Regions:
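N-terminal basic/disordered segments at the start of proteins
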Residues: 7-38
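Short aromatic-hydrophobic micro-motifs that form the base-stacking/packing surface
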Residues: 12-14, 87, 143-145
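A short acidic Gly-Thr/Ser loop motif
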Residues: 15-20, 145-151, 207-210
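A generic fold-level signal
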Residues: 6-8, 18, 139, 149, ...
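Short, Lys/Arg-enriched, disordered terminal segments
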Residues: 1-10, 194
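Conserved ATP-binding subdomain of kinase catalytic cores across diverse folds
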Residues: 34-53, 69, 79
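Helical "lid/coupling" subdomains associated with nucleotide-phosphate turnover
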Residues: 11, 25, 52-83, 91-141, ...
Length: 291
């Protein structure tokens, strides 16, 4: 390719989470030796696989059929957008489902879409690798926290360098199903308390649809730096928790699949913030599918 020529290529990522399944298509424009990324399409479908898995241990036949239908739809969309390469990743619900591997084989057979079931560590690292380029200020200590439906991924950064990646089976859908073990909460609290001793004055970088929504709902925030104080999140969480599901939907324009999980999401972020003594949360609006 000539140095002055522009080449455009579309790539896709599919994120099969415990609450929703997402398709993200991005265009990569290569110009004068530099790559520029732009979002072409983003679709979110609340399949809510975790409500089956964290209750009965497997994905129901109905949701399996819907998964296959959805992957067929995604495949057609990728053809329309002339996608050259796609990576599909399944996380916590598929990891835990007894029939997860069987469903993935069926999906590939019927749709041609290959799905990788990734572990929590890889999930955390994909999110981290995507995040690095979004952060202008890499000085100090940050804990990158991605709260999903089935698990919470944590990356600790110090002076822009990755210190460690951790994954915990604590997620919003798990909490709604009362499926989080006390031992998992203890593991998270003990781990973070130890990290806080070695890395004081750590603040949070929040990832996931719930923290994005909470940030948008917050009355007081720094729009330029995309941050909100933990105290502001606490006030908002208290206000939302006092409302019924229907009231949250009516007063804040939430969809049903957001109005229920936003409460446990707030609890997870606040628990982590209190353990490490964070004063604010930075919300860059990126997640697994962006990586």
């Amino acid at each position: 390719m000539n140095e002055n020529e522009t080449r455009k290529t579309n790539y896709a990522a599919i994120d099969i989470g415990s609450n929703a399944v997402r398709l993200l298509i991005k265009e990569i424009k290569e110009e004068q030796g530099k790559a520029h990324f732009s979002k072409v399409l983003m679709l979110r479908v609340p399949l809510r696989l975790g409500f089956d898995v964290f209750d009965i241990g497997k994905i129901s036949e109905k949701k399996e059929k819907n998964m296959i239908r959805l992957m067929k739809a995604f495949r057609h969309l990728m053809k329309i957008y002339d996608v050259k390469h796609c990576r599909a990743c399944a996380t916590s619900a598929m990891r835990d489902a007894k029939n997860g591997m069987d469903i993935i084989k069926q999906i590939e057979k019927k749709t041609g879409v290959h799905i990788d079931i990734i572990d929590g560590q890889e999930e955390a690292k994909i999110i981290y690798n995507n995040h690095v380029e979004h952060m202008e200020d890499q000085k100090g200590n940050y804990m990158y926290v991605d709260v999903g439906g089935g698990s919470t991924e944590i990356n600790l950064l110090s002076e822009g360098q990755l210190v460690c990646s951790r994954s915990y089976n604590i997620g919003t859908v798990r909490m709604l199903n009362n499926a989080v073990k006390d031992s998992e909460w203890e593991r998270l609290k003990n781990d973070l308390a130890e990290l806080a001793k070695s890395y004081p004055q750590t603040n949070i970088i929040g990832s996931g649809g719930n923290i994005n929504k909470l940030y948008r709902l917050a009355d007081k925030k720094n729009k330029k730096k995309m941050t909100m104080q933990v105290s502001v999140l606490q006030e908002l969480h208290t206000r939302l928790k006092a409302l019924s599901l229907e009231e949250r939907m009516e007063q804040f324009g939430m969809k049903p699949d957001r109005a229920d999980v936003i409460i446990p999401a707030g609890e997870i972020f606040l628990t982590i913030a209190n353990i490490i003594g964070a004063s604010y949360i930075h919300v860059p609006v990126i997640g697994l599918s962006d990586g």
